[in-house]
């Protein structure tokens, strides 16, 4: 009896390229699902302790606060109401 055919790559390359051969997706953060709880907790604390320091022109400098920090919503609403009241008062005159 003759041996049977085991494998063929006929037409496979064309089929593979039809939708394009894409690179595998690299995720920024790997899942910690199923990891031992104690190990995961230790990793979290270790990550906090090894934060990268910010360098500017080779010297250590403090991270400066923003020039215009974000205002609380109450302050923004109060300013808008005051502006609207001023417009109404100017319109009545």
Swiss-Prot record:
Record key words, sorted: Ribonucleoprotein, Ribosomal protein
Superkingdom as given in the UniProt entry: Eukaryota
Name by which UniProt lists this protein: Large ribosomal subunit protein eL29
Any one GO CC term of the record: cytosolic large ribosomal subunit
Family: Belongs to the eukaryotic ribosomal protein eL29 family.
GO BP term, pick one: cytoplasmic translation
GO molecular function, one term: structural constituent of ribosome
Biased composition (Basic residues): 1-31
Record region (Disordered): 1-33
Pfam families assigned: Ribosomal_L29e (PF01779)
Residues making up the signal peptide according to the UniProt record: none
